[in-house]
Swiss-Prot record:
Organism taxonomic ancestry: Bacteria, Bacillati, Mycoplasmatota, Mycoplasmoidales, Mycoplasmoidaceae
The protein's name: Endoribonuclease YbeY
Gene name of this polypeptide: ybeY
Keyword Nuclease assigned: yes
Protein EC: 3.1.-.-
Primary site of residence: cytoplasm
Purpose: Single strand-specific metallo-endoribonuclease involved in late-stage 70S ribosome quality control and in maturation of the 3' terminus of the 16S rRNA.
GO cellular component terms, semicolon-separated: cytoplasm
Length: 155
């Protein structure tokens, strides 16, 4: 499985670290969940205004959120394109501070969270939330992307 990054905020991703981390996450998820290597998805990094518009137009929720995913699979037709996710740069910055961990950890958490949504995971029901969040933690911990602010990059 591979991905295409679109950066509409021009504040991040000049550093190869994030692309490497995203590839590590994507490769690990592909292996764990046996995802066809030909599948791909798009990840867009956007500002607060853009994500609020997307949230309002497609989810009828008029507020800024951190990540939104649109899975293209409907269960019957499987296309190479899994879907698209949108991550709000400013929410990454704000939430890293709020939760007292690094920018890298928050960014990778939201990337993983959005990817799992593209693969059909959700957290509407408590039992589904436990499964999804346990898988997120397993992936991030295996890659040593932890909540320890001292050991991680904090941009």
């Amino acid at each position: 499985m591979h991905f295409l990054i679109t950066n509409e905020v021009k504040k991040i991703f000049n550093d190869k670290l994030y692309s490497q981390r995203f590839k590590q996450i994507t490769d690990l998820v592909s292996t764990k969940l046996n995802i066809d290597k030909k599948r791909f998805f798009e990840c867009h990094f956007v500002d607060e205004k853009t994500i609020q518009e997307i949230n309002k137009n497609y989810r009828n929720k008029d507020y800024i959120t951190d990540v939104i995913s649109f899975a293209f699979d409907d269960g019957e037709i499987i296309t190479p394109l899994l879907g698209e996710m949108y991550i709000c740069y400013q929410k990454v910055v704000d939430q890293a501070s709020q939760f007292a961990h690094s920018f890298e950890r928050e960014l990778c958490f939201l990337f993983t969270h959005g990817l799992l949504h593209l693969l059909g995971y959700d957290h509407i029901k408590i039992e589904d939330e436990k499964i999804m969040f346990a898988l997120q933690d397993e992936i991030l911990n295996e890659l040593k992307i932890t909540r320890n602010i001292n050991g991680a990059r904090n941009d």
